[in-house]
Amino acid sequence: MEQDNLYNLLQSIDTPDDLRHLSADKLPEVCKELRQKIIDELSCNPGHFGSSLGVIELTVALHYVFNTPYDRIVWDVGHQAYGHKILTGRRDAFCTNRKLNGIRPFPSPSESEYDTFTCGHASNSISAALGMAVAAKKHGENNRHVVAVIGDGSMSGGLAFEGLNNASATPNNLLIILNDNNMAIDRSVGGMKQYLLNLQMSEGYNRIRYKISQMFHRWGILNEERRKSLIRFNNSLKSMLVQQQNVFEGMNIRYFGPIDGHDVNNLARVLKEIKDMQGPKLLHIHTTKGKGFGPAEKAATIWHAPGIFDKETGERIVVDTKGMPPLFQDVFGNTLLELAQTNDKIVGVTPAMPSGCSMNILMKAMPERGFDVGIAEGHAVTFSGGMAKDGLLPFCNIYSSFMQRAYDNVIHDIAIQKLNVVLCLDRAGLVGEDGPTHHGAFDLAYMRPIPNLIVASPYNEHELRCLMYTAQLPDKGPFVIRYPRGRGSLVDWKCPMQEIEIGKGRKLKEGKDIAVITLGPIGVQAEKAITHAEQETGKSIAHYDLRFLKPLDESMLHEIGKRFKQVVTVEDGVLKGGMGSAILEFMADNEYNPQIKRIGLPDQFVQHGSVKELYHICGMDEEGIYKVLISF
């Protein structure tokens, strides 16, 4: 009851209709309660913190001014949409956010009609919202508004510019909200960041243009000829009143702002003024990531997703990791620095994830050799290719699910030319609470068919170090190393690095009845299951670590094909087209006929939950592998 008293207004808002019945003077209090609700919930149930706090006022203003869900709001990335979820019927369920069978971590149309488009990756909001705005026009729904909310570094993505470039090509009333907080997860980078910092627009120009537009709209005399005349007048007016060229206006998108994104009443006023203007338009707002929670405002990167924390003191509850294996990410970062200290050709590239992938270790020690290119995965790959073409050796680290956005670049710009680029796919396999948009489910299947690639996955931290060492040796060509999120299995991980023969797996355990073939760290789960199954059944089970999906260790597979009638494959990726499929193809091509059972991700988008829970559901944990082994 005491907790409910903190949310007197919020408790009365079950849908945005309830919000719209409040007087405008109540909106600041709604914002205060909404911000406190997120702080309270995320202090004990971790999630994306800073981004959601930064758009509280915008979220309230949007649902207050627009007739959602008839009017469409498309969130870019979606990690800032917690306030939106709470205001749209999920207030009481918000405590289940990111938990197994709870509400989803990002907006999802299957969860709510207020979630207009699936999101989780960056830079797609303008294109999606533009499509909706054009569809509304085609359907004669001239009173339907469509809003794209983009920020958190997403404007550095090429898809955002493709949407902007196309926005004025077809009649529509799209409104783009540019949430400018100078942040992605880490600090935003690049020319667009600097442009937005400097951008100013004449208030007189905006005011005059708006009044003229309203007058023509009110009189009903805005035909095509007059619209073209207005555009010519607009350009002349702009040349007189605007002090600098505006890239958005150059694309025939009306620009408004920048304005304070934390003044909810002024935001609502401006949105009301511009929402019925004809044609595409952009409202530029300035916000602070983590607004309203002091520690998050001061350290936005750490507080992007801080984990559990004390909401009174702001102290993050850090788990004691002494005696635990390291994160694969930290092994990568430290090993990269170690290699760079002896190989002056090595450089590091990351698309806006230096802290997430631990590229920041190299960037701090050797800032001139680390490149954060912003949320631009395709550019990151081709940029790496360009450096490799002229003698550098890039380690390009991209999350597996985000590498999907750069697939053509891998084929066209790296593989065909057989360039010496090391593609490190972090977060490969199931990642847990971030759900289907972030699981690294497909990389084995989509990398396997590409000629000239080497595709490998380490069993543990030692193998990661040795694969990185091998990849930086001369003339290896394009080299893909995939590894999961989280901790490995070895506490003592700083082994001497040595070359691994390309395409060579290893036999971890001898056996005579069943052969288990694994790829990557999921082999540790199989190792436990093998011990359990042997104890229960008395069967002798061999264990092979494939290490390389491409090229395959054909001599090892010939041995398995000749010796075993029962084979189990285990992989942390989709079964269709993955490692198990490669084994099936090899056995068929070489006329071996063992009984093969494959363990991996099913043909569906796996939901969110802890990795442990999801492994169990997919039958990929020790228990699931054990059940398959004893089923022969």
UniProtKB/Swiss-Prot annotation:
Reactions mediated catalytically: D-glyceraldehyde 3-phosphate + pyruvate + H(+) = 1-deoxy-D-xylulose 5-phosphate + CO2
PROSITE patterns cross-referenced by the UniProt entry: TRANSKETOLASE_2 (PS00802)
EC number(s) stated in the UniProt entry for this protein: 2.2.1.7
Gene Ontology CC terms, in alphabetical order: cytosol
Pathway listed: Metabolic intermediate biosynthesis; 1-deoxy-D-xylulose 5-phosphate biosynthesis; 1-deoxy-D-xylulose 5-phosphate from D-glyceraldehyde 3-phosphate and pyruvate: step 1/1
Keyword annotations of the record: Isoprene biosynthesis, Magnesium, Metal-binding, Thiamine biosynthesis, Thiamine pyrophosphate, Transferase
The protein's assembly and partners: Homodimer.
Name of the molecule in the record: 1-deoxy-D-xylulose-5-phosphate synthase
Native source organism of the sequence: Phocaeicola vulgatus (strain ATCC 8482 / DSM 1447 / JCM 5826 / CCUG 4940 / NBRC 14291 / NCTC 11154)
Classification lineage: Bacteria, Pseudomonadati, Bacteroidota, Bacteroidia, Bacteroidales
Gene: dxs
